[in-house]
A protein has these predicted regions:
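N-terminal helix-turn-helix DNA-binding core of bacterial DNA-binding proteins
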Residues: 10-54, 71
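Alpha-helical DNA-recognition elements
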Residues: 59
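Glycine-centered, phosphate/nucleic-acid-interacting loop/turn motifs that mediate DNA/RNA or nucleotide
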Residues: 64
Length: 114
């Protein structure tokens, strides 16, 4: 594969997984936006900027998957915290199941499944 197709493939994979990763980052409980970014930056190959997640979080709010609350901070301006709604948890569960099926299928194709 030359650089063009591989680069395009990597971009498409990251776009597809970003929503799944954002929702999974919110599963333990409410998160400040920047904390989500820091968690996602720890995922090798994801490569995201701070501005990347906020439009997605906004769309999740519109769709009812995420709620946001603004809280005063002693460390500067007020912060917006995000958390999953019951609908968001249901969607995440279904997305994780779909990802697990796809991932297992790819592993089987590669001969890596046990």
């Amino acid at each position: 594969m030359d650089e063009g197709p591989l680069t395009n493939w990597n971009v498409q994979i990251r776009k597809g997984l970003l929503e799944l990763c954002i929702l999974n980052a919110l599963l333990p409980g409410r998160q400040y936006g920047y904390d989500i970014v820091k968690q996602l930056r720890d995922i090798d190959g994801l490569m995201i900027g701070e501005g990347t997640i906020y439009p997605i979080l906004s769309r999740f709010r519109t769709q009812g998957q995420v709620e946001a609350t603004i809280e005063e901070s002693t460390e500067g301006p007020a912060r917006k915290y995000y958390r999953l709604t019951p609908l968001g948890k249901k969607c995440l569960s279904e997305m994780n199941q779909a990802w697990d099926r796809i991932h297992l299928g790819v592993l089987k194709l590669r001969g890596d499944a046990t």
